[in-house]
Regions:
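Carbohydrate-associated surface elements
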Residues: 209
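A common structural junction motif
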Residues: 122-129, 221-230, 341-350
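Active-site SXXK
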Residues: 61-72
Length: 429
């Protein structure tokens, strides 16, 4: 296979069982570490098993507001002194909420690791959620949602989720709606924190200029005795089938000069054997080069899109396969038809051997680039743990990609992508 020299050159330096240390603390926290002494910095990333999946329907955005409030104050620091501590050593620290997890990310020098870990521990174990800061962030959230309501791309994506995930928790936006944010009180965030934050299922990755034993001992000292016996766990994620016929939803946003659209369907979860064939197929359909076949047809040859590409997203539970475009409002129906035609062709015959070879080379060639920084490695370690992929994932990944055939892509694609059963979401003037 051509263009795999970058992977072959760096294969021996990719993270694996020989240089990843995995350790479980007594309270349920999993620690993953990898040393890299080429620079004096550390990347510290982690997640807790709490997110918007636990939000009540009438208080969507609660997990988002709770995560946003973790750095507003702790039992030891107020908002300003906490940020001063971080900035005084040139470090960074932030928290954010997703559907299934609440994440944190920090970057610092090796000698400042204990300071940053202590601050992470404070924010997770003793946040105070001051009323004035809660009100400020609530207002900021309402402003962000007002901006979202005028964003054609964001609203098309929201509409798309409501079609393919109808009746499913994934149809709900993590940020909620203005009417749900309005109902949330400081007391709600305090209670959500007490109910759902804890060490069970928590994962921390430390990558950089540190020995594994030192990192593990530091985490034992800062988070090893944290417990929440009443920690609420995430519910089982329900399954969902494909929509039975093409369904279109449109949202009018007056005054806009561009329309955004999303066409697509549900996709398998991350651990499905269908994931890799679809990943390579998606690259051919709307990613590789100038955004694959979609980019060539809709943008290059027809000139009808400002941008067009496809995206395959998979996690736990049902995923999504989206074809996304920004177009002149007068071209919406034409572009939807073109995308549908490309989908129909894509499921009618195998991809070419050249397309398959190029796509495989792309995935193998980019892997070392994704893992060249401490941050990239830390993110990857979290993914290995989150999806139970195994510490040897990067050593076995090439075989998985190289084994994919054009016929396998065709048969797998047909299981999900049906040109007569598409979700079509449009937002524009």
């Amino acid at each position: 296979m051509k263009n795999t020299s970058l992977y072959n050159e760096h294969q021996h330096t990719l993270p694996g069982p020989d240089d990843i240390t995995r350790h479980e603390l007594g309270n349920g926290i999993t620690v993953l570490t990898r040393s890299n002494h080429n620079s004096p910095t550390l990347s510290i990333k982690g997640y807790l098993k709490t997110g918007s999946l636990l939000d009540p329907n009438d208080k969507l955005g609660l997990s988002y507001l709770t995560a946003s409030g973790l750095m507003n104050g702790t039992a030891q620091h107020n908002f300003q002194s906490l940020y001063n501590e971080v900035e005084s050593v040139g470090a960074s620290l932030n928290f954010s909420a997703g559907t299934l997890t609440t994440s944190f990310s920090a970057h610092c020098l090796r000698e400042d690791m204990m300071l940053i870990l202590k601050l992470i521990s404070e924010c997770l174990r003793s946040p105070t959620f001051p009323e004035k800061d809660f009100n400020r962030q609530k207002n900021q959230m309402l402003t962000a949602l007002a901006i979202r309501a005028q964003d054609t791309a964001a609203m098309a994506a929201l509409l798309f989720d409501q079609i393919i995930y109808a009746g499913h928790p994934y149809a709900r936006p993590e940020e909620g709606f203005p009417e749900t944010i309005q109902t949330i009180t400081r007391e709600d965030t305090v209670q959500f924190y007490k109910d759902t934050f804890g060490p069970e299922g928590m994962v921390v990755a430390v990558v950089g200029a540190i020995d594994p034993e030192t990192a593990i001992e530091a985490l034992k000292g800062t988070l090893g005795d944290w417990n929440n016996p009443n920690q609420q766990l995430l519910p089982e994620i329900p399954t969902i089938g494909p929509i039975q016929k093409t369904t279109q939803k449109s949202l009018s946003i007056p005054g806009k000069s561009q329309a955004d659209l999303v066409v697509g369907c549900t996709a398998p979860e991350r651990l499905s054997p269908d994931y890799y064939p679809l990943q390579v197929g998606n690259n051919i359909l709307g990613q590789f080069g100038m955004m694959g076949r979609l980019g060539k047809r809709v943008r290059e040859e027809s000139g009808l899109a400002y941008y067009v590409y496809s995206s395959l997203s998979s996690s736990w539970g049902p995923g999504a396969w989206e074809m996304i475009a920004g177009v002149n409002p007068q071209s919406v129906e034409t572009v939807v038809e073109m995308i549908t035609e490309e989908i129909r062709e894509f499921v009618s015959e195998p991809v070419t051997e050249e397309e398959l070879s190029d796509s495989k080379s792309y995935y193998l060639g980019r892997l070392p680039l994704l893992l060249e920084s401490n941050s990239g490695v830390a993110i990857s370690l979290l993914n290995l743990e989150h999806f139970k992929l195994g510490l040897d994932f990067f050593q076995t990944y090439p075989q998985k990609i190289q084994a994919i055939t054009a016929e396998e892509i065709l048969l797998t694609t047909r299981k999900y992508l049906n040109p007569d059963q598409l979700a079509v979401a449009i937002a524009g003037p």
